[in-house]
């Protein structure tokens, strides 16, 4: 979690953690400018059925509230977050095994002229994404391009912005964008690299289009921002926030 908070704070974005099993969806919805679904090493095969159900209930509730209220409410999913957005829109768990661990280029789809995200990037940066080991991929699951094409719900809702290759050379979807709503997702981890800050800049510009205000942000900031995470030497790269 710390890497995501540090990533957002680089651009002055304040973070308000939302418990995945909260019942106060309306309260949180009015306090945030958008929803971010982070990656996690606790995938659907590791989480309990109750945890998965609670997470999906909250995601579905926030999504339906944004649709019902007709507000510009950006939603972003990273890795695990992308998988759950696909499950929400596609109606079932359609991801398959696409293991990847390391830095990989991504291939930008041909028809991205209508993409809000891709069109926000300068051409030299798009070249960098395709020609260099530009994105950190760390996942076991993903979704194939074929699945995005054959699932009518996904095909109508999302545009495939980019693809990448897993350890065995199989192609999977690396980035998607809703055709009509501010919903975005990537399978890689832009929060782990400074070179992927343009993705954050884009999402920041999307958040600015929402007018919600959080009256308790100063208090939240005092709790979160200066907080020193507990660091456990036995868990490599593991840093945790604790909330009472």
Please identify what each model-predicted range represents:
Residues 1-180, 187-244:
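N-terminal beta1-alpha1 cap of cysteine-dependent amidohydrolase-like domains
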